[in-house]
Amino acid sequence: MTLGGLLKHLAWLEELDFQHRLAGQPLSAPFDQLDVERDWEDWPWRTAVDDAPDALRALWVDTVHRSRETLTAALARSGLEQTLPDGMSLRRLLADLIEEYARHTGHADLLREQVDGVTGEAAPQDFWVP
């Protein structure tokens, strides 16, 4: 597990949940490179080693921006109780994504502390918050 792998994994979940599952859109680059049935679980972890840190952060930021736009439109249209094509409610999708971020921010905190001793008590001053 790497910080880059975590970022790409979270970007992948944003793309899958908001663009694909909620909006019904085809996967965008680079997510369109994978076979969802075969690769969905390990693809971000396996391929992140080939990506520059700035590219991974840019991918996550861009994906989060698109997710927020999609979510805003969906909430305006039908609220939290709307049902996605797979039967899940939007409320449940958001709860699952919050849980996923909570788990992985804990992982990131542990990885970061092992690298330089810094803990997740405070984000850097220049850290972008969605």
Predicted regions and their residues:
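Short, contiguous alpha-helical
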Residues: 1-41, 82-130
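Acidic/histidine-rich alpha-helical segments that form the ligand environment
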Residues: 39-81, 91-102
